[in-house]
């Protein structure tokens, strides 16, 4: 569900009951409700920089949800995260995010100036840098600026742990950074090396696992991150119990259920995977709490995609066609993916003329996107699926 560069909800001291309530909304994808609570908490605690981080976090993730950028497909495949389309938050969202980030920096830096070994302040500013790194990449597509903030985030997280080794929650940043850089291609990894981040994929995973078991406030964040990492590492069996626990804790979060379906599909458990998708569709039809935000056509794409991987092309096509027909109404990433997958499915059935029409819809939807380029390539040359023996 989460991109690996995303920053999680850190706080070294136990969260107040009010903030805990805000994060219950947050993890249930109810970002407007979470934001309202965080802002009230900020009014009651105006000197706390972490609350400004919570506000920025909710604003960013709300924009990511609307853009279809929270699914773990961001971290599957060959650095698919680096190919994501640029997000376009509103001017109000951008201003609110910038204001929260500025306040977080100002308050944390004042404490660090007074006491450089203030672990809580170092932790807070590490999160602020990380949030801005995420924003620089997803919204501005400013890779170098993002890398600078990414590096600063790690540096301050290390200072927090050095000042207080008991800050287990803060270690998630170190593990996240190690895993991300350790997973990058050599060209990107070179930039990380020059910035002082060498990367350690296995070590990063171990650190995140430690936080999931021993963290104070970040256990849920670590579990979410581990589920995405395990899928990327082709260890989906490890992710299933994590997601089942998250679904029980946050039943209104439809993404956890959709991710579970994908994990089950990875494991070859076709019936369970399809049943999980169908259960989400049923909740959406009944307008169950939390399921009014997901469109039926997005669910159709995900089901069609699962059927594609199970070689059930005849069953996949109507689901994918439903998503393609709604390509202008669903999020851009899903719309593009649906056009591409429908074309590929038709190609595998030797219906290339129909496939070309699907590919052309993808090209027209976002001509400069990476997926549009892929669509154009298959329009010119029929898609052939590589089999792993």
Regions found by a protein language model. Give the residues of each.
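Terminal, low-structured helical/coil segments at or just beyond the last alpha-helical repeat
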Residues: 213, 217, 299, 348, ...
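Short coil/linker segments at helix-helix boundaries
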Residues: 13-17, 21, 25-37, 47, ...
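TPR alpha-solenoid repeat register
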Residues: 51, 121, 170, 221-222, ...
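Alpha-helical linker/edge segments of TPR/alpha-solenoid repeat scaffolds
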Residues: 62-89, 139, 181-189, 235-238, ...
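Amphipathic alpha-helical segments of tetratricopeptide repeats
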Residues: 43, 155, 162, 212-213, ...
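"A position-specific structural signal for the A-helix of alpha-solenoid helical repeats
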Residues: 20, 54, 61, 124, ...
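Residue signature of alpha-solenoid helical repeat architecture, marking inter-repeat boundaries
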Residues: 12, 46-47, 51-53, 116, ...
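Structural signature of alpha-solenoid helical repeat scaffolds
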Residues: 43, 113, 145, 162, ...
């Amino acid at each position: 569900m989460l991109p690996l560069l995303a920053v999680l909800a850190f706080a070294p001291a136990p969260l107040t009951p009010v903030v805990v309530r805000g994060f219950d909304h947050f993890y249930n994808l109810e970002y407007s409700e979470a934001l309202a609570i965080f802002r009230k908490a900020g009014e009651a605690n105006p000197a706390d920089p972490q609350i400004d981080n919570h506000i920025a976090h909710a604003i960013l993730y709300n924009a990511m949800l609307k853009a279809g950028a929270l699914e773990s497909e961001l971290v599957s495949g060959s650095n698919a995260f680096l190919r994501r389309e640029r997000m376009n938050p509103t001017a109000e969202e951008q201003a609110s995010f910038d204001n929260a980030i500025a306040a977080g920096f100002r308050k944390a830096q004042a404490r660090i100036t007074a006491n450089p070994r203030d672990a809580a302040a170092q932790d807070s500013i590490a999160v602020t840098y990380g949030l801005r790194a995420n924003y620089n990449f997803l919204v501005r597509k400013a890779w170098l600026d993002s890398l600078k903030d990414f590096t600063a985030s790690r540096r301050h997280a290390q200072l927090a742990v050095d000042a207080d080794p008991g800050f287990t929650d803060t270690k998630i940043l170190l593990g996240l950074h190690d895993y991300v850089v350790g997973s990058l291609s050599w060209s990107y990894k070179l930039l990380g090396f020059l910035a002082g981040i060498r990367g350690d994929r296995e070590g990063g995973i171990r650190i995140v696992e430690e936080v999931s078991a021993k963290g104070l406030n970040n256990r849920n964040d670590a579990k979410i991150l581990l589920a995405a990492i395990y899928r990327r590492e082709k260890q989906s069996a490890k992710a299933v119990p994590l997601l089942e626990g998250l679904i029980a804790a946050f039943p209104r979060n439809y993404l956890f259920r959709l991710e579970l379906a994908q994990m089950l599909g990875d494991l070859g458990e076709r019936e369970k995977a399809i049943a999980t998708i169908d259960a989400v569709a049923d909740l959406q039809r009944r307008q169950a709490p939390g399921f009014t935000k997901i469109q039926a056509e997005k669910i159709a794409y995900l089901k069609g995609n699962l059927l594609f991987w199970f070689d059930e092309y005849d069953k996949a096509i109507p689901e994918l066609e439903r998503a393609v027909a709604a390509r202008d109404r669903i999020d851009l990433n899903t719309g593009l993916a649906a056009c591409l997958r429908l074309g590929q499915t038709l190609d595998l059935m030797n219906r290339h003329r129909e496939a070309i029409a699907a590919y052309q819809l993808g090209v027209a939807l976002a001509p400069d996107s990476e997926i549009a380029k892929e669509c154009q390539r298959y329009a010119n040359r029929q898609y052939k699926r590589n089999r792993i023996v």
